[in-house]
Each structure stands twice: as structure tokens, then as C-alpha cells.
Amino acid sequence: EFDAVIMLHNEYVTRTIFDAVTDHPNVLYLYPNALYAEIEVNYADETITLIRGHNYPEPEITNGFDWEFDNTRPYEYDTMCLDMQFYEIKNGWMTTCYPELKMKESATLLTEIKNIVTGNDS
């Protein structure tokens, strides 16, 4: 068992991973678009199959898990992160932008991440 889980851009996941992450009480979803599409993995054949999501198998299906906290839109395409914020959801925190560039430029972001996952407000 882990005290905290930090999700990166884990867009394609199995139902097992989705359930494990969303059932954990302290998750930091660092990138929008995490947990977006349900896949099935066949380790014997070394294949990954899209089960649901990305408008499949029906055009109206976006998030493959119908996840109430999907924050893909509008945040996935904000790569500048000029006003990056963390906001709380039922089992953790999410961000309001795609922080790839900001992580390379901001030393304070790592401190913010540490404070969120450890519950330290300072």
C-alpha cells in the first residue's frame, strides 16, 4: 500500500488499474487526460486493445470509463500553464493544465507536488 500515488499522463489503462487508482484516497493527477481510455492487455500476444474511449465503440463515448472527474477538456491543451492550479476531487488533486514544460522550468512546482501528496500546507 502506498501513502500517495502520482499519476502522469496515464491515458490508456485497464479496468483493474482504473479501479485501483480511483479507489486510492490520495492521488495527484498531474496531467489532464489521465484514465481516459479503457484497454485490455494480452501479455502472451504482446498486444494492447482499445476497449472503450476516444469515440469507440460509439461516437458519443469520449472517456472510456465515463469518469466523473475526467478533466481532459478544457485542460489537456493548455501547455503554457500560465495559471496552473491544483484543485481537489474526491480522492485527491488535479491540475488545470498540461505541465510538461512547467516542470522543466519551475523548481517550486516540485515543492508544491511534495506538499500536496504529504498533506503539508507550508
Predicted features along the sequence, with ranges:
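Short, well-ordered secondary-structure micro-motifs within conserved domains or adaptor modules
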Residues: 2-10
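A glycine-rich, often tryptophan-bearing local segment used as a flexible ligand/cofactor-contacting loop or short
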Residues: 12-97
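Histidine-centered active-site loop/cap adjacent to the catalytic His
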Residues: 97-122
